Structures are given as C-alpha cells and as structure tokens.
Amino acid sequence: KPSNKKKFTDVINIGIGGSDLGPKMVTSALHPYHDGPKCHFVSNVDSADLQDTLKNLDPENTLIVIASKTFTTIETITNARTAIQWLEAHLSHNISNHLVAISSNTKEVKKYGITSDRIFEFSYSVGGRYSLWGPIGLPILLALGERKFLDFLSGAEEMDNHFFNKRLDENLPVLLAMTSIWHRNICRYSTR
C-alpha cells in the first residue's frame, strides 16, 4: 500500500525484453478482466516514454516496479533512476513503499536503497520468455487480482499437461507448429 494507506491506482513496470514484453502482452490481452491498478510499461531509454507516463500520474498512488534479471541493464536502470527522482521530488516522506524490484541480483538491487522485503527474487536460470510465470508476472497479478491471476496460472498448467500428455495428433501446440511449418515451407506463405 502507498504511504497514504489507500490503494495504488497505478503501477509502472520498468523493464526491457522478458521483463517487459510478457507482462505487457498479458495485461493488454486480459485488459477486460482487470480488477486492480492500471499498469503502465516503460522500456524505452528515450526519457520521453517515461515522462509521458509520469505526467498524468499521482506519485502518492503510484507503485514503481523495477524488473531486471541482472539489475544492470542500462535502459532499465536509467528509467528507474528517473522514476525514483520523480518520487523523491513529489513525496515528502520515505518513498520505499512506492518501490519494488524483481531481480536475480539482490546485491545490485540493494544499492538503490530497495530493502529485502521489497525484492521479488528469481533464479538467474529463468529465461526471459518464461519469466512472466514467476515474479516478473507481478504486474499481471496486480492488474488482474489474485483470483484471476491464479486462474491464468492454472490455464498455463493445463496447457503444459496437455502438451506433455497428448498424442502428437491431438497435441494442439504440436499441430499449430506443424501448420506453421506447412504454411511457410510448403505453401510459401510469407506470414503466419
């Protein structure tokens, strides 16, 4: 919760690659089911992207999520510093309630004054394209609410089970992949 004891109305996810694309895609696709704060995604090192996002938000009701596997990615760190400065310029109290970090490098995170209880850690071995199923999915959880997020995870588990247990001729991911290969290599379609 923000310092004013109300609920956050906005969440800014600062990340790039897998720390941005997956959560951004899912929150966009599931927008009709949102039951939480509005999520904004900033990945561009061009400061105009972040400034355009910040100008319409109330820092008192905004949570900044800094998502970076290594916490050394220049685009993410540059935007994170700017967002932290924005909070400091507008809030007279400690900004720690308005910051969380998601990273596999907690040592680096702590250099930014983010305490252990505000860090969601994940294994360095988790690849970017799969990270939305773990802590990187925090913006999805916040946007959807706990119940709908658990339904989302349950659906993913069902598809995993389907993939591992169905015969090839009944296996939807395999059939889609084979159809894609057929369209591209045999039919010579230039797009999917």
Predicted regions and their residues:
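Active-site phosphate/pyrophosphate-binding segments
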Residues: 86-192
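Gly/Ser/Thr-rich loops at beta-strand to alpha-helix junctions
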Residues: 12-22, 69-77, 106-108, 127-128
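Conserved beta-strand elements of the Class I
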Residues: 10-14, 63, 100
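Glycine-rich oxoanion-binding loops at beta->alpha junctions
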Residues: 1, 26-28, 32-63
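Cofactor-/ligand-binding subdomain signature composed of acidic, glycine-rich
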Residues: 1-9
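Alpha-helix capping and helix-loop boundary segments enriched in small/acidic/polar residues
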Residues: 40-54, 67-78, 96-100, 123-130, ...
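A glycine- and small-aliphatic-rich helix-loop capping segment at beta-alpha/alpha-beta transitions
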Residues: 21-36, 56-58, 78-88, 113-119
